[in-house]
Amino acid sequence: MILKRCCEKLENLSLKIAFIESASSGYLCSQFSIYKNTGADILLGALVSYDPNIKQHILHIPRSLILQHSAESKEVTHAMAQQGLHLFTDADIVVACTGLLKPGGSATTEKPEGTFFISIAYLKKIKDIHYLLNGTALERLDQLTELVAQEVLNIISV
């Protein structure tokens, strides 16, 4: 399982990870916490910013950025990762996630249900990723977890 390998690699490198989640509502953080002898050693925690007011008032994401691009966008997710580094000062890696897990939100034909934006901050760089996932909400979250774990593994293995 990729998630387990990712957690073991984080632990071996003594790296700490934190999450700023919207669409995934803390699911990514919970999945990274479940492995014995890794969760407590690698995981700092998470902020779930499902409501745009949390993004604005806690993460200090400008309202204008949200209005211009929507709360579920590459630009807002990138800003969330940047702000996550300020919230989680001991984090080596911050993973931010927005998207459209279920119908509604800012869904369009160009950005349909199942769209996710991920930004991963590590070593003063931020990698932005876009996924379009199929399946039920839970299937999408499980796919997203594995994809994020693989991206983190790729980033820390360079």
Regions found by a protein language model. Give the residues of each.
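Short alpha-helical segments enriched in small residues
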Residues: 1-158
